[in-house]
Each structure stands twice: as C-alpha cells, then as structure tokens.
C-alpha cells in the first residue's frame, strides 16, 4: 500500500507493508494510489510536523529492508545527532571498516527510509554536501531544518 503527499521538499511517497513503513522517498508523482491506512495517515502527519519543525522525532513502525551491510550502515547513520554531520569515512570507521567509505556511500544511495535513516547528515571528506540521492538542495534544506 502506498500514499503520496506534498511537502516543502517535494512529494513524499510512503510504502506500508505488514503494518510497518518500509519506504519513505521523494518522488515526482503526486497523489495517492489508494485510500491511506491509519498508519500511512499517521506517518504523513508526523512527517509533515517534522518538516515544519513542530516535531523532532518520528515514531511510527518501520522495517528496514536491505542487506546486512546496508542495515549496519543505516543503523550507524541513525547515531548521527540531529543537526550534525559526519563524513562517509567516519561512518565507515564507525562500522569497523575505515576503508569502506565508498560502500557506505552506496548504502546511503539505497536508503529506503528518508528522514528515519538520515543520509542527508553524511558529507564528503572536505565537509562538502555531496552524494544525496535527492540532490544537494534537499540535503541542504534538511540540514538547515535540523539546526533551527
């Protein structure tokens, strides 16, 4: 089941499966494919409040779908404090493989849970805003939102 709604950073599509949100992504498509479930409505409500700086945490049920390595990276990304940034290399070191910064970048690119897994907090070695699946403007917007 999917549900799409508009936000300040673009249309967000939510995917629910088995009572959990398994995907939060920016999309070009607007509208909803079916009547939203209570969980999809709750997730939309929380995300909308988050993007208005009215909420700091999202606490609806999620399920991360990915390889064991991707899930390890995603958990490490969730440890980055709101408003802070870390480099791909620092996250590679955090998961125990200081030479895996490119693999960390690839895991970020496959992140199914925008906002829950904060890939926007990961920056290049020179602290430059690089490598965000939804573009650097969205990355900058999310980082600025978190420091307000």
Where are these regions (language model features)?
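Short clusters of hydrophobic/aromatic residues that line enzyme substrate/ligand-binding pockets
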Residues: 58-62, 104, 129-132
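Short Lys/Arg-enriched helix C-cap and helix-to-coil transition segments
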Residues: 115-122
């Amino acid at each position: 089941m999917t549900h799409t709604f508009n936000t300040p950073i673009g249309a967000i599509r939510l995917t629910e499966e088995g009572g959990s949100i398994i995907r939060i992504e920016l999309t070009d498509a607007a509208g909803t494919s079916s009547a939203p479930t209570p969980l999809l409505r709750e997730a939309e409500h929380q995300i909308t409040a988050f993007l208005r700086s009215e909420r700091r945490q999202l606490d609806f049920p999620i399920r991360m779908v990915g390889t064991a390595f991707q899930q390890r990276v995603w958990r490490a990304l969730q440890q980055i404090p709101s408003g802070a940034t870390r480099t791909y290399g620092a996250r590679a070191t955090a998961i125990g493989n200081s030479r895996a910064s490119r693999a960390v970048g690839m895991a970020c690119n496959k992140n199914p849970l925008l906002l829950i897994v904060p890939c926007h907090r990961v920056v290049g070695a020179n602290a430059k805003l690089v490598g965000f699946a939804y573009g650097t403007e969205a990355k900058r917007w999310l980082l600025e939102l978190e420091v307000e």
